[in-house]
Amino acid sequence: MSPTPTSRVATLKGGKGPGRTIALRADIDALPVEEAQGLECRSLVPGVSHVCGHDAHAAMLLGTAKLLLSLKDEIQGTVKFFFQHAEEQAPGGAAEMVKAGVLKGVDACVGLHVMNDPIGLVRITTTPAVTTTCDEITVTIKGRGTHGSMPHAGVDPILVGAEMVLAMHTIVSRNLPPGRFAVVSPTIFQAGNAVNVIPDTAKIGVNFRTKSEEDRDFLFERIEAVARSVAAVHGAEVDIHGVRGCAATIQDPAMIERALRVAKEVMPADKVATGTGMTGSEDFSAFAQKVPSVYLILGGGTAEEGYPYANHHPAFRPDEGCFMAGVRIEAAMALDFLMRP
């Protein structure tokens, strides 16, 4: 089944008849990053590579499908395998798959991602929010250009933008209490192309993340308010464009407990850990908003184990020794959900 042009869904129906349905999801898209030279598994496509581990996710889900297929006659219920496109591109392929109806009849969903944890370690986040929202605002500042020697004759959009950036950096620390995660990161500042010209315009791009919809709405409102008020003080104007990306991934408490129990049953004791989530974002949230879900972190190797590069680095790669651990936990979660309600 192809719910979208670049995603796939495979279905395995158990030999013991109908029952519950669980979906296992792997994101499969690459990144616009030139992979580092010298890697034995280097991308053959110029400027594009799997430096976030999504190729590993696809391989593990295929392995899980093969394993569960061999156990088909012992399974009651259905397993769906989601090979999802466009996780890296807001608002994300998961939402498109949900819109296409892939969750019809699905009772639960499991996601997994390789990170820089010890090889084969399964980390379960015990708090509901395992990932954050991911949103952005672009502010175009309209000043009035002038000669670099006569700033009084214009409205300097660079100065306006600089004050905006400084003010935006105070939004979290002066409005949200410690322990309530949020981050506002101005990441783009573009202006001018000549050293003796104060330009007409400048552009600021802001990325911001949090773990609650309440704080998400607050950040949208406050970033815009800061931009408009700072511009007004200097006699500038602004155009503001916001993009609402993926929501925070909120796990189901019962699925968290199930994952903890299953991991302890099928993994070595030193290969199970707990955590409090991460500050990055994941469009798996689109599935988690609709059905009870859990999102697992799988260790692909640490610097001490010879894997010093984090996800999105041109030389990132997980140790293939983690693949069997990923297959084991995915298959075990599926079997446990179907056979031990």
PLM regions with names:
Residues L31-S49, D55-A56, L61-L62, L68, ...:
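Histidine/acidic-residue-rich, glycine-tolerant segments that coordinate divalent metal ions
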Residues A10, L24, H54, F81, ...:
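Divalent metal-coordination and catalytic microenvironments
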Residues L159-P341:
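Metal-dependent amide/peptide-bond hydrolase catalytic core
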Residues R20-A23, T78:
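Residues that mark the start of a beta-strand
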Residues M1-T4, H50-A56, G277:
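Active-site nucleophile and cofactor-binding loops and adjacent substrate-binding regions
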Residues M1-P18:
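A non-catalytic alpha/beta surface segment that caps or lines the substrate-entry region
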Residues A23-R25, I137-V139, Y295-G300:
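Non-cysteine beta-strand/loop elements that form the S-adenosyl-L-methionine
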